[in-house]
């Protein structure tokens, strides 16, 4: 897990006010404007890489274990209120469940059976998030192409 050093003094001051959780976003929540609407008290810290996972689409973004691969995303500090709002947005615990790596929380889909491409508007939201975080869209485009290939194979 690659995390650049964080400003521990700022986090310590914030923790005195409210307990926070480190949250890794890899889909639509990377979009800073959308994240602020869902979680006004969230703080974007930096881009982050989650090793041994890959981005896939099941209509919406998901990640799955994939040794040797990586997922780039956004690291946020979120409050308990933010986490509850994200739980509702992500359909926790029915659509997504929470997982943790090195005390960083992220959501993964419960149903891992089908790969299916995202809608155009949803994809634009994610692309904006990639731009917000200064992350190359190469892996995003690869994941979309994989989902389109899977769809083509299911039609044939």
Spans of features found by a protein language model:
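Glycine-aromatic micro-motifs
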Residues: 12-156
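Short, Lys/Arg-enriched N-terminal segments with co-localized hydrophobic residues
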Residues: 1-10
